[in-house]
UniProtKB/Swiss-Prot annotation:
The gene is LAT52. This is Anther-specific protein LAT52. Disulfide bonds join 35-106, 38-147, 59-94. InterPro entries: Allergen_Ole_e_I_CS (IPR006040), Pollen_Ole_e1_allergen (IPR006041). Keywords: Disulfide bond, Glycoprotein, Signal. It comes from the Eukaryota. Residues 1-17 form the signal peptide. Belongs to the Ole e I family. PANTHER family: ANTHER-SPECIFIC PROTEIN LAT52 (PTHR31614:SF42), PROTEIN DOWNSTREAM OF FLC-RELATED (PTHR31614). One of its GO terms (cellular component) is extracellular space.
């Protein structure tokens, strides 16, 4: 009888431990938005962080394409944003999109580069509640002075500046 009580107690404790380990699925998505001053579609030493840029995270069901989650945010003085995603979105495609630039001189977006895809599920092999999105950007209408030199330092040779 004593063995049965010990066994039952151990099972109850394990069940409670498993319950205590449960946590709501909440993810933080962090990223950055910058102004591409050289119009090369990647960051250079002349790129400028964009404070006040609006970004939107949107999750859509893979099969139906119905929106399952959406949240907007604004970048800080360093061009960084942090968005909170509630729930597991294993069956969704989640993307962060640049929505609006705070600067009139740097507001051009490039089709195909205005989004960063992220995984918002515990079931993808990532054991961290923070997800990092690729940097997003807006471009100036014209390249600024010094771009040729900045690209030369990187070993890149621009075709036209």
């Amino acid at each position: 009888m004593a063995k049965a009580i010990v066994l039952l107690s151990a099972l109850c404790i394990l069940a409670l431990a498993n319950f205590a380990h449960c946590r709501p699925e909440v993810f933080d998505v962090e990223g950055k938005v910058y102004c591409d001053t050289c119009r090369v579609q990647f960051e250079t030493k002349l790129s400028e962080n964009l404070e006040g840029a609006t970004v939107k995270l949107q999750c859509r069901n893979i099969s139906t394409e119905a929106e399952t989650f959406s949240v907007e945010g604004v970048t800080d003085k360093d061009g960084k944003y942090k968005l909170t995603v509630n729930g597991d979105h294993e069956n969704d495609i989640c993307e962060v999109t640049v929505v609006k630039s705070p600067r009139e001189d740097c507001k051009e977006s490039v089709s195909g580069y205005e989004k960063a895809r992220i995984e918002c599920s515990d079931n993808v092999g990532i054991h961290n509640a923070v997800r990092f999105a690729n940097p997003l950007f807006f471009m100036k209408a014209e390249s600024v002075q010094g771009c040729k030199e900045a690209l030369d330092e990187l070993g890149l040779f621009p075709l036209e500046f």
